[in-house]
Amino acid sequence: AEEAKGIVKGDTEVNRMERDIEHRCMTLLLRQQPVASDLRFISAAMKVVTDVERIGDHAADIAEIVPHLAGVRKAGDPAVSRSIEMGRKAHKMLQDAMSAFAAEDEAAAKSVIDADDAVDYDFNTIKRMLAAEIAADPSKVDAALDVLMVIKYLERIGDHAVNIAEWVEFLRTGRYHHEKMF
């Protein structure tokens, strides 16, 4: 419960950092008038910081749900176990996306994009497990919906990691989704 509270409090700090980074980027744009790769970096950084802020929001939402789940789901619960594994995958995607962005590593970014299929697969598998659970015992609907919310947030975290990875191509080439931007 304390860890969950810490995550929720941390979201406020993430929001503050987002504003600070955006302010710094705008200051650079206005004062330095960057061109080419510098402009691409600043533009991509502003996009990435938005994704990171949203990931923080999702983490805070998960942290608010998890303490309740601990009271209604049993240890070894298959849906919870699979959700934990899904969370590990989404977390690794985020770490790898941030590393790929920092290193401007297109191959690493591509690996992040490819990894999203596994997170999406887990989401759909767990969703089906929960639907079957509710069909078998409608009294479990509230606990199942809490797990469903958690896995949806995890799936969105994976999507934001993909967004971050997609900005690597832009950093290197000025292309985003294979379209020349500048």
Language model feature labels by segment:
Residues A1-F182:
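Cytosolic, long alpha-helical scaffolding segments
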